Amino acid sequence: MARNIGLDVPIPETECEDVNCPFHGTLPVRGQVITGKVVSDRMNGTVVVEREFLHYVKKYKRYEKRRSRYHAHSTPCINAGVGDVVRIAECRPLSKTTNFVVVEVMTE
Protein backbone atom coordinates (compact mmCIF):
# COMPACT_ATOMS: atom_id res chain seq x y z
CA MET A 1 0.00 0.00 0.00
CA ALA A 2 1.34 3.42 -0.96
CA ARG A 3 1.58 6.15 1.63
CA ASN A 4 0.97 9.89 1.27
CA ILE A 5 4.30 11.76 1.00
CA GLY A 6 2.81 15.24 1.47
CA LEU A 7 3.32 16.43 -2.12
CA ASP A 8 0.73 16.85 -4.86
CA VAL A 9 2.07 14.04 -7.08
CA PRO A 10 0.30 10.93 -8.42
CA ILE A 11 1.00 7.64 -6.64
CA PRO A 12 2.67 5.05 -8.93
CA GLU A 13 0.50 2.09 -10.00
CA THR A 14 3.22 -0.54 -9.59
CA GLU A 15 4.53 -1.47 -6.16
CA CYS A 16 8.18 -1.96 -5.29
CA GLU A 17 10.16 -3.46 -2.42
CA ASP A 18 12.70 -0.61 -2.24
CA VAL A 19 13.35 0.58 1.32
CA ASN A 20 14.33 4.02 -0.03
CA CYS A 21 11.06 4.54 -1.93
CA PRO A 22 9.05 7.51 -0.61
CA PHE A 23 5.76 5.77 -1.53
CA HIS A 24 6.36 2.10 -0.59
CA GLY A 25 9.36 2.36 1.73
CA THR A 26 10.25 4.43 4.78
CA LEU A 27 12.07 7.39 3.20
CA PRO A 28 10.66 10.78 4.30
CA VAL A 29 10.88 13.74 1.91
CA ARG A 30 11.31 17.35 3.01
CA GLY A 31 12.80 20.58 1.72
CA GLN A 32 13.28 21.49 -1.92
CA VAL A 33 11.21 20.18 -4.82
CA ILE A 34 13.00 20.63 -8.17
CA THR A 35 11.99 19.96 -11.78
CA GLY A 36 14.67 18.92 -14.26
CA LYS A 37 15.63 16.63 -17.12
CA VAL A 38 17.32 13.23 -16.70
CA VAL A 39 20.67 13.29 -18.51
CA SER A 40 22.10 9.97 -17.27
CA ASP A 41 20.69 6.74 -15.84
CA ARG A 42 23.82 4.60 -15.99
CA MET A 43 24.23 4.32 -12.22
CA ASN A 44 22.48 1.50 -10.39
CA GLY A 45 19.27 2.96 -8.94
CA THR A 46 20.37 6.58 -9.41
CA VAL A 47 19.81 9.17 -12.14
CA VAL A 48 21.49 12.51 -12.85
CA VAL A 49 18.98 15.36 -13.18
CA GLU A 50 20.01 18.64 -14.81
CA ARG A 51 18.22 21.95 -14.24
CA GLU A 52 18.80 25.06 -16.37
CA PHE A 53 18.14 28.53 -15.01
CA LEU A 54 18.90 32.16 -15.82
CA HIS A 55 21.32 34.17 -13.66
CA TYR A 56 21.37 37.97 -13.82
CA VAL A 57 24.80 39.61 -14.33
CA LYS A 58 24.55 43.09 -12.85
CA LYS A 59 27.62 44.52 -14.59
CA TYR A 60 26.30 43.80 -18.10
CA LYS A 61 22.57 44.02 -17.29
CA ARG A 62 22.06 40.68 -19.01
CA TYR A 63 21.09 37.15 -18.11
CA GLU A 64 23.33 34.12 -18.57
CA LYS A 65 22.29 30.49 -18.76
CA ARG A 66 23.51 28.29 -15.94
CA ARG A 67 22.83 24.70 -15.04
CA SER A 68 23.17 22.50 -12.02
CA ARG A 69 23.18 18.72 -11.71
CA TYR A 70 21.65 16.63 -8.95
CA HIS A 71 22.04 12.93 -8.23
CA ALA A 72 18.63 11.47 -7.38
CA HIS A 73 17.56 7.98 -6.31
CA SER A 74 15.21 6.37 -8.85
CA THR A 75 12.93 3.66 -7.50
CA PRO A 76 11.76 0.67 -9.61
CA CYS A 77 8.11 1.78 -9.39
CA ILE A 78 8.87 5.16 -11.01
CA ASN A 79 11.53 4.00 -13.53
CA ALA A 80 12.91 7.31 -14.89
CA GLY A 81 15.05 7.19 -18.03
CA VAL A 82 17.23 9.53 -20.09
CA GLY A 83 15.25 12.42 -21.59
CA ASP A 84 12.42 12.29 -19.05
CA VAL A 85 11.37 15.49 -17.29
CA VAL A 86 11.10 14.56 -13.62
CA ARG A 87 10.27 16.13 -10.29
CA ILE A 88 12.73 15.37 -7.48
CA ALA A 89 12.32 16.00 -3.77
CA GLU A 90 14.98 16.49 -1.12
CA CYS A 91 15.49 13.72 1.42
CA ARG A 92 18.13 12.58 3.88
CA PRO A 93 21.56 11.70 2.43
CA LEU A 94 21.36 8.29 0.74
CA SER A 95 25.04 8.29 -0.27
CA LYS A 96 27.94 10.72 -0.54
CA THR A 97 26.35 12.61 -3.45
CA THR A 98 22.68 11.54 -3.44
CA ASN A 99 20.32 13.78 -1.43
CA PHE A 100 17.23 13.68 -3.66
CA VAL A 101 14.66 11.10 -4.76
CA VAL A 102 12.52 11.03 -7.94
CA VAL A 103 8.85 11.42 -7.01
CA GLU A 104 7.22 11.93 -10.43
CA VAL A 105 7.94 11.49 -14.14
CA MET A 106 6.20 14.47 -15.74
CA THR A 107 6.91 13.80 -19.45
CA GLU A 108 8.77 11.02 -21.20
Curated annotation (Swiss-Prot):
Keywords: Ribonucleoprotein, Ribosomal protein, RNA-binding, rRNA-binding
GO cellular component entries: cytosolic small ribosomal subunit
Protein purpose: One of the primary rRNA binding proteins, it binds specifically to the 5'-end of 16S ribosomal RNA.
Organism for this UniProt entry: Methanoculleus marisnigri (strain ATCC 35101 / DSM 1498 / JR1)
One Gene Ontology term of the molecular function aspect: rRNA binding
Protein family per UniProt: Belongs to the universal ribosomal protein uS17 family.
Gene: rps17
Coiled-coil annotated residue ranges, if any: none
Gene3D superfamilies in the cross-refs: 2.40.50.1000
GO biological-process terms attached to the record: translation
UniProt entry tagged with the keyword rRNA-binding: yes
InterPro entries: NA-bd_OB-fold, Ribosomal_uS17, Ribosomal_uS17_arc/euk, Ribosomal_uS17_archaeal, Ribosomal_uS17_CS
Binding partners and assembly: Part of the 30S ribosomal subunit.
Name the record gives this protein: Small ribosomal subunit protein uS17
PANTHER family linked: 40S RIBOSOMAL PROTEIN S11 FAMILY MEMBER, 40S RIBOSOMAL PROTEIN S11-RELATED
